[in-house]
């Protein structure tokens, strides 16, 4: 299994208190495949470097997880299908 870090930018109109529960729905796919979610860090609302879908701000969240590559690809696919998610970035990190 490999370590990954996923940066997610969500729609700023979403309530920040609902970010973690809504991300848990997507992260359940990682847990079902035998991976584990190590940390979910919600940074809150921040200004974007450039507008995305005519939005100047976004809610940033960083998720650290350990899973197989096919699991993280499925997670990224599901996140990109959701309208409330503006952008995602998946990075493979070094083992801890």
UniProtKB/Swiss-Prot annotation:
Which PROSITE patterns does the annotation name? RIBOSOMAL_S6
Keyword Repressor in the entry? The reply is: no
* SUPFAM superfamilies associated with the record: Ribosomal protein S6
User: Known InterPro entries for this protein?
Assistant: Ribosomal_bS6 (IPR000529), Ribosomal_bS6_CS (IPR020815), Ribosomal_bS6_sf (IPR035980), Ribosomal_S6_plastid/chlpt (IPR020814), Transl_elong_EF1B/ribsomal_bS6 (IPR014717)
Query: HAMAP family in the record, alphabetically?
Result: Ribosomal_bS6
The protein's name: Small ribosomal subunit protein bS6
Q: Which cysteines are joined by disulfide bonds?
A: none
This protein's UniProt keywords: Ribonucleoprotein, Ribosomal protein, RNA-binding, rRNA-binding
Question: Encoded by which gene?
Answer: rpsF
Q: Choose one Gene Ontology CC annotation of this protein and give it.
A: cytoplasm
Gene Ontology MF terms:
small ribosomal subunit rRNA binding; structural constituent of ribosome
Say yes or no: keyword Glycosyltransferase present. no
Single GO biological process annotation from the record: translation
Q: Name one Pfam family in it.
A: Ribosomal_S6
* UniProt record similarity statement: Belongs to the bacterial ribosomal protein bS6 family.
Query: What is the stated purpose of this protein?
Result: Binds together with bS18 to 16S ribosomal RNA.
What NCBIfam families does this protein's entry cite?
S6 (TIGR00166)
Q: Which domain of life is it from?
A: Bacteria
């Amino acid at each position: 299994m490999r370590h990954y870090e996923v940066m997610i930018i969500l729609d700023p109109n979403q309530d920040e208190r609902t970010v973690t529960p809504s991300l848990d729905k997507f992260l359940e796919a990682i847990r079902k495949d035998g991976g584990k979610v190590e940390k979910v860090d919600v940074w809150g609302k921040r200004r974007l470097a450039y507008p995305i879908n005519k939005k100047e701000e976004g809610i940033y969240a960083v998720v650290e997880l350990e899973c197989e590559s096919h699991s993280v690809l499925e997670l990224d696919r599901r996140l990109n299908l959701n309208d409330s998610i503006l952008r995602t970035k998946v990075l493979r990190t070094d083992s801890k």
